[in-house]
Every structure is written in structure tokens, then in C-alpha cells.
């Protein structure tokens, strides 16, 4: 069996640790804990790292297509490895949740998130496992684009790091239990 854990974000130093890149931040943490490094794959348009856990190959994926085209990399990997949608877990930011909150879902619309919209368009379904990490709404008249592409202030950054630890725990629990519904019940409380 194989699992794809995909963190959404934008490639490049310019976007490092911005609000829109919390998916990349989580994937980076998982890679660090597993002591694996990423290599760029031009065919899949993604940075990939992998490890084995309980006999399953786990791919850590950071699409390099920029957020709005994330579905290209996800679809290419699912197709190449002949994986089911159940083998996919997407981790991404959510404007409509307060900073640091997490929510696990097994289906849903894009909710205005262009990376999720791209994935839905490319894989042809809204039914896939996902973990949303709250980044909050823009304040003081800031545009949504400026908000998601900005870095966290100090207090929010501390909260996001704590959230990433919780998401890390939930992902590891999911990989051990192999049941996303059970993981949702445990971590959505």
C-alpha cells in the first residue's frame, strides 16, 4: 500500500512560512521527523520525499505548480501509482477558521480555496481526506491575497506551530490506524 500526504503551498523562498504555506510547513515537519529529504520531480511537478511505516510507503508531497495548479501534481501522482482517492490526504490553510484551529474532513467543496478547487477539477471528486488549518480572516481592510501571502505575526506563529504539532499527531494516528473516520472522531473534538 501507498499513501500520498500532500501539503499545499507556493514554492520558493518568497513564500516560506506564509499563511498560505501551512500545508508545506506540516509536510516539512513530517519529513524532518522521518529524517528524509525532498527531491524535485519535474514529471510530477512536485518535491517528493518518502519513507516506510508499517509496511506502507508514504510519500510526502509539495506541489511546485503554485497553489492554483496543485491538482496537476496530485492527479499525476495518483495516476502514476494507481492509487485510490482513499490513499490521499491533503493538508492546507483555511481562511474561515480562526488561527490555529484544525478540522479533518472526508469530503467538501473548495470553499473558495483555489488549490482545493484545482484538485477537485483534476481528480473529478470532492470526496477526499483533508486536514484544514485555520489562518483566520484578513484584518484592517487587508485584501485576502495579501493576507494569505503574508507571514504570521509572533502570537499567531506560536499558535500555528502548536497546530502543526497537533496535525502531525493526527496524521501519524491516521497512518497507524488506517481509518480516517476514526482519526476525525479523535481530533475534531
UniProtKB/Swiss-Prot annotation:
Hydrolyzes ribosome-free peptidyl-tRNAs (with 1 or more amino acids incorporated), which drop off the ribosome during protein synthesis, or as a result of ribosome stalling. Catalyzes the release of premature peptidyl moieties from peptidyl-tRNA molecules trapped in stalled 50S ribosomal subunits, and thus maintains levels of free tRNAs and 50S ribosomes. One of its GO terms (biological process) is protein quality control for misfolded or incompletely synthesized proteins. TRNA binds at residues 15, 66, 68, 114. One of its GO terms (cellular component) is cytoplasm. It is found in: Cytoplasm. It is an enzyme of class 3 (hydrolase). Its EC number is 3.1.1.29. InterPro entries: Pept_tRNA_hydro, Pept_tRNA_hydro_CS, Pept_tRNA_hydro_sf. CDD domains: PTH. Monomer. The active site is at residue 20. It comes from Streptococcus pneumoniae serotype 2 (strain D39 / NCTC 7466). Belongs to the PTH family. The record marks 93 as: Stabilizes the basic form of H active site to accept a proton. The lineage of its organism: Bacteria, Bacillati, Bacillota, Bacilli, Lactobacillales. Disulfide bonds: none annotated. It comes from the Bacteria. The record marks 10 as: Discriminates between blocked and unblocked aminoacyl-tRNA. This is Peptidyl-tRNA hydrolase. The keyword Cell membrane does not apply. Keywords: Cytoplasm, Hydrolase, RNA-binding, tRNA-binding. SUPFAM superfamilies: Peptidyl-tRNA hydrolase-like (SSF53178). GO terms for molecular function: peptidyl-tRNA hydrolase activity; tRNA binding. Pfam families: Pept_tRNA_hydro. Its main location: cytoplasm. It catalyses: an N-acyl-L-alpha-aminoacyl-tRNA + H2O = an N-acyl-L-amino acid + a tRNA + H(+).
